């Protein structure tokens, strides 16, 4: 079976994670895909297949005889999809020989256009997979799952010599907790790769340092007709806080290694208001400087409006795994070589986000990220090509060969 055929089977299984849930997994529906994958892993000849009660799925492919002493290499992808855009009733559409221009998705008003996604012109002539424009596609990260499964199948069918291989599929990556309950010892790999990137050939090992920053503003509400010098409008204070941040240090104004403050949500009345940010930077010192800026704003606002008006809570999320990967750069060197062997241009890029591999690297499993061939995740424009998926399978297959040498 080809990777895209598996993807088409997987995306119709609904698996949104829920950031407001206190359970693990955050949504019971993730077990629906996990059980399907559990059965498929067993059919493919994986051993020690275990689906635990927190929806982590593990399996192993024992080494070819004589290669048992080679490093155990793991491959990881996540089962959940985002819940911040419609994920109900996903209807994938396959467009053969895409012309590289504007494409209406199904009967929706959603137009996939090179004006917004210039790389589309490079996909001319390929077979393009999209949703019908009303939902996400779910290639993030079911494409990664499909490619890992297809690689395992190919190794078995073609009897490709290999060292010990480990496979895991995780829940809740999209809400930042995918690695929280990952059992590294159970997994059994010395090194790992997540397949959770974009363009085929992507190699990523420098991710953001990340935290959440939550402001709660307490106002003082009196009748507006008699409030001179007494009213404190919490919503206006919230506006002051946001205006105190560097105006260009937002996702829209930054790229590559540049960090940002991102206002995720806000709410407010006169009496109380809230601002919820995520803060990101690749550079550790610049990241710390951003947190100091937030604390200084809190201090300034309380000096202006009265102590206790503004309360800031900063919650750490994840760190840049580059410091861990720097100790085992063979992971990157071999990934580059695997791309070249698969006739794919290696693209070493910073991750403007995070993956399960970020946290796993700090739990003792160095784990850079590889591309799957997908684009424009987390919305109705999400798309991937059959050819990109095939090449991603080629890359991980070549990786397996390199670690068996």
Over which residues does each language-model region extend?
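N-terminal capping segment at the start of a domain
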Residues: 2-28, 130, 318, 378-379
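A non-catalytic alpha/beta surface segment that caps or lines the substrate-entry region
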Residues: 22-70, 74-76, 80, 91
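Active-site metal-coordination/substrate-binding segment of hydrolases
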Residues: 67-161, 189
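Acidic/histidine-rich catalytic neighborhood of metal-dependent amide-processing enzymes
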Residues: 121-208, 248-268, 272-282, 288, ...
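Phosphate/diphosphate-binding glycine-rich loops and adjacent basic-rich segments that engage nucleotide
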Residues: 194-227, 231-237
């Amino acid at each position: 079976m080809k990777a895209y055929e598996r993807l088409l089977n997987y995306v119709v299984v609904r698996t949104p994670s829920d950031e407001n849930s206190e359970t693990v997994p955050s949504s019971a529906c993730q077990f629906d895909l996990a059980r399907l994958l559990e059965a498929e892993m067993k059919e493919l000849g994986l051993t020690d297949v275990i689906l635990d009660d927190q929806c982590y799925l593990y399996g192993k492919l024992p080494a070819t005889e004589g290669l048992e002493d080679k490093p155990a290499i793991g491959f990881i992808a996540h089962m959940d999809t985002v819940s911040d855009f419609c994920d109900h009733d996903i209807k994938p559409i396959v467009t053969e020989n895409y012309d590289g221009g504007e494409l209406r998705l199904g009967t929706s008003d959603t137009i996939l256009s090179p004006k917004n996604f210039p790389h589309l012109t490079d996909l001319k002539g390929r077979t393009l997979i999209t949703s019908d424009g009303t939902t996400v596609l779910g290639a993030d990260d079911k494409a990664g799952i499909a490619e890992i499964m297809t690689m395992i199948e190919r190794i078995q069918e073609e009897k490709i010599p290999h060292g010990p291989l480990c496979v895991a599929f995780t829940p809740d990556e999209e809400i930042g907790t995918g690695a929280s309950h990952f059992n590294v010892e159970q997994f059994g790999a010395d090194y790992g790769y997540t397949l959770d990137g974009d363009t085929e050939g992507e190699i990523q090992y420098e991710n953001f340092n990340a935290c959440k920053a939550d402001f709660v503003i307490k106002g003082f509400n009196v009748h507006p007709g008699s409030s001179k010098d007494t009213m404190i409008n919490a919503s206006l204070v919230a506006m002051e806080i946001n205006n105190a941040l560097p105006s260009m240090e937002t996702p829209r104004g930054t790229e590559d290694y540049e960090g940002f403050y991102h206002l995720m949500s806000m709410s407010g009345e006169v009496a109380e208001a809230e601002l919820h940010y995520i803060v990101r930077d690749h550079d550790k010192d610049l990241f710390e400087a951003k947190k100091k800026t937030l604390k200084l704003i809190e201090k300034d606002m309380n000096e202006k409006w009265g102590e206790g008006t503004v309360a800031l809570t900063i919650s750490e999320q994840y760190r840049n795994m580059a410091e861990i990967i720097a100790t085992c750069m063979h992971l990157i060197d071999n990934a580059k070589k695997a791309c070249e062997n698969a006739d794919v241009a290696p693209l070493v890029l910073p991750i403007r986000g995070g993956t399960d591999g970020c946290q796993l690297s700090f739990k003792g499993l160095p784990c850079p990220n590889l591309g799957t061939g997908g684009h424009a995740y987390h919305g109705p424009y999400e798309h991937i090509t059959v050819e990109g998926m095939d090449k991603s399978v080629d890359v991980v297959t070549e990786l397996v060969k390199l670690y068996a040498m």
